């Protein structure tokens, strides 16, 4: 799973993946994404998660990832949104978290942390279940052609 800022750096600006792969080589990446409209809204102002959980984070859209590989020899071979399944994972994490609050408190976490973490897990679950937030598994392949 990639850090929110990592795809553009790994795939485009730094050229690290393009340089590391041989022609025909494949690279797989799992990354949380947003539809283009939500991506643009994130860029204009911080949402709750950007403020409290991942300060400065910016999840890309699939189009942003595609643009980041435009001047490389990388080709997008597959992109699957597994967000609906990830929503179920988040629900299980939240239920497990709530079932173990005594252990959480015993580790020194206060009620503010507990409320924030429960809200974060529920917010993410809802986002993935509705498609507002996506979780893409992407496969890229290094082509044999010349970059334009």
Positions of predicted regions on the chain:
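A short SAM/SAH-binding and catalytic strip from SAM-dependent methyltransferases
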Residues: 1-9
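Residues at alpha-helix caps and immediate loop-helix transition turns in enzyme cores, especially N-
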Residues: 9-10, 89
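A short glycine-rich, Lys/Arg-flanked "PGG" loop and its adjoining helix->strand segment in the class I
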Residues: 11-26
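Alpha/beta-hydrolase-fold catalytic nucleophile elbow
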Residues: 30
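Substrate-binding/catalytic lobe of Class I Rossmann-like enzymes that use SAM or dcSAM, i.e.
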Residues: 33-148
